[in-house]
Amino acid sequence: MRSLFLILLGLAAVSAIGEWENFKTKFGKKYANSEEESHRMSVFMDKLKFIQEHNERYDKGEVTYWLKINNFSDLTHEEVLATKTGMTRRRHPLSVLPKSAPTTPMAADVDWRNKGAVTPVKDQGQCGSCWAFSAVAALEGAHFLKTGDLVSLSEQNLVDCSSSYGNQGCNGGWPYQAYQYIIANRGIDTESSYPYKAIDDNCRYDAGNIGATVSSYVEPASGDESALQHAVQNEGPVSVCIDAGQSSFGSYGGGVYYEPNCDSWYANHAVTAVGYGTDANGGDYWIVKNSWGAWWGESGYIKMARNRDNNCAIATYSVYPVV
């Protein structure tokens, strides 16, 4: 019996080594020296074990989402939070326009991707600029719904130029402050004219390359998922700020993400709600566009639990632009 146990243990170790080698090949991983590679391998092995144990629970029907290896599975949870989120810890208390209660019937499901209002998933890289990507994604949708043109807009423009409005480039910011800058600036440049660098740089805004403008912005009632649903249905993609602080979030692979340990009011990551629907197994969900590249989640998206007590603060800090 002991011999069989040792054999199985050895096979598991060989399988894990194979996963590590496949990971390095798939994502082109190179490390500075053997010590760094050894450390990254240790981090990867811990994460692989965490993923496998979680997915066993998924197979048993105990949770509604599964996890997977992705391009930052060699980063610790703390490193992911430090480099892939980017919310500053403060909150603007007032809306520019009055908040209004939902008055129109709610559609059963909405997906603005199917209407052509959403650009391909982008990647913020090792820069805490999620706030810029979130603000831009909602504006790209609003601009499309008004003009019929889907234009990829410049996150780098916001990273470099909106510090006077409280944003801190790669060190964090808020989407509503991005809109304040665009309003005062009378526009934001296109992505093609002002490409993303994932660093803080000098402002190079050019009024000749404006891709969209903003006249004002609206914040749906804080913590009210019905108000957020109304906004997504009637206004288009909405910038939302969430609690992405749980270890499971970084390795999300698919399904409806319900995390009981999430906070309903604290947020550390900005993303974009581009629709909603209902899953037969996972229940109601939000369709959320992330900015961590297409390798993450469901081709860069996550289905986040909807109508489950504002799980992960999905409706606490939402805002959409008016163009």
From Swiss-Prot:
One GO biological-process annotation of the entry reads: collagen catabolic process
Q: Which residues form the propeptide?
A: 17-106
List its EC numbers.
3.4.22.-
Q: How does activity depend on pH?
A: Optimum pH is 6.0. Unstable at pH values less than 5.0 and remains fully active over a wide alkaline pH range.
Compartmental location: Secreted
One Pfam short name: Inhibitor_I29
EC main class here is: hydrolase
Predominant localisation class: secreted
Q: Which GO terms describe its molecular function?
A: cysteine-type peptidase activity
Query: Is Cytoplasm there in the keyword field?
Result: no
Catalytic residues (UniProt) = C130, H269, N290
Briefly, what is this protein's role?
Cysteine protease which may be involved in digestion. Shows highest affinity for proline at the P2 position. Cleaves valine more efficiently than leucine and exhibits 10-fold lower affinity for phenylalanine than proline. Can cleave type I collagen.
UniProt protein name: Crustapain
Supply the source organism for this entry: Pandalus borealis
**Phylogenetic classification of the source organism:** Eukaryota, Metazoa, Ecdysozoa, Arthropoda, Crustacea
